[in-house]
């Protein structure tokens, strides 16, 4: 998907060549993703990823076979080869490392310009973008990543507001304001942004410190990070911490 995007942006034919090759490989060997994945928290599905890539390759090449794959996944309610349901009834997860169905849904809607396809996207976003004064918390484990992921897809949908019928830009701006410090604590969640930025993000190389069991002078675990990881987003609060 990223190579197809790069081709669309920069016109490098080699990017497109390898985007097609990787797509074909992934489609041919789908079971590798889940049969060979022994990590308990690892990705066990692949259809969303291939659909995401198919959408970009359709935009890059105009080859209808890519659109067919995307449409089949997005319009199916059944279980695919990997056990992953299609998205006929909508999207149920923010864009993340393990599920890119939202991205695929937006691509399909952009391509088809269909009101019903946009509805798959906006129905989900309507359920999340409910308040400009309340921090949106999808999950307390790293809530900020999910917050900004929903912001991103909400802003893309707003870009196509003539087709989607929705404009979430005000909501997204309010959510980003809270992340950057416009909240009851005055703290922001972005490292290196200002004096109220996080000083102790969990990042091994940025810490600049090492474990020192003999207390020979190495800074303790609670010391500020030795290197500023500018732009990094820390975990984030619960849904009520910024109230």
What feature does the model see in each segment?
Residues 36-39, 86-90, 130-142, 159-161:
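Acidic, serine/threonine- and proline-rich low-complexity regulatory regions
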Residues 1-88:
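Catalytic cores of extracellular degradative/oxidative enzymes
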């Amino acid at each position: 998907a990223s190579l197809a995007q790069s081709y669309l942006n920069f016109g490098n034919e080699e990017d497109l060549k390898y985007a097609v090759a990787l797509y074909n490989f992934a489609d041919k060997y789908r079971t590798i993703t889940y049969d060979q994945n022994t990590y308990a928290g690892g990705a066990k599905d692949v259809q969303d990823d291939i659909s995401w890539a198919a959408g970009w390759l359709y935009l890059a090449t105009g080859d209808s076979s890519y659109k067919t794959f995307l449409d089949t996944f997005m319009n199916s309610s059944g279980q695919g080869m990997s056990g992953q349901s299609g998205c006929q009834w909508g999207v149920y997860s923010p864009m993340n490392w393990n599920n890119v169905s939202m991205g695929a849904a937006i691509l399909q809607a952009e391509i088809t310009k269909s009101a019903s396809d946009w509805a798959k996207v906006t129905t989900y976003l309507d359920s999340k973008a409910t308040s400009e004064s309340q921090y949106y918390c999808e999950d307390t484990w790293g809530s900020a990543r999910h917050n900004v992921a929903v912001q991103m897809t909400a802003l893309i949908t707003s870009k196509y507001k003539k087709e989607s019928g929705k404009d979430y830009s005000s909501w997204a701006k309010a959510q980003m304001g809270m992340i950057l410090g416009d909240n009851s604590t005055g703290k922001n969640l972005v490292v290196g942004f200002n004096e109220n930025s996080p000083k102790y993000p969990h990042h091994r190389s940025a810490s600049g410190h090492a474990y020192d069991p003999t207390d020979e002078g190495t800074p303790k675990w609670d010391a500020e990070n030795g290197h500023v990881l500018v732009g990094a987003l820390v975990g984030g609060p619960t849904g009520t911490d910024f109230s």
